[in-house]
Amino acid sequence: IERAGLEPRIVTIPFDTPTPQRFALVQSSLDQACARSPIDAVFATDDLAAAEVLEWARTRDLSVPGDLSIIGFDGTETMRRALPHLATIRQPISQIAQAAVDILLEQMEGTLPRPIDEAGESPAPTLEFPGTLIPGRSLSA
């Protein structure tokens, strides 16, 4: 985004927003964002949010990907079946789960080495798991 000289606009919907209010909040937030300047792409934090953006675009007669590109984040089998055309980043859920279990077991057994930082804290380990782009028809070139 930075290399393209674009400045992202971040729209935040609280995670614990009940489903009936969530979609209305997504719609009003995107409407407000578009009132300031056009939106040409949305990177949703999960595939359900991306589905809500797709519905918002449909109700505003926006073409996806012509007018708006949308990509989600999850790539779960359920969402892939429901929205096979949605571009998404698939998380390696089994690897994440296995690493979480391994860390938990090491903590329970007391075998997890935890470095102490300058503040005397023992921060949790940082693990990175590469996602996989699942291209769909919701992205323009």
Regions of interest found by a model, annotated:
Residues 1-141:
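Bacterial carbohydrate/catabolite-sensing allosteric modules
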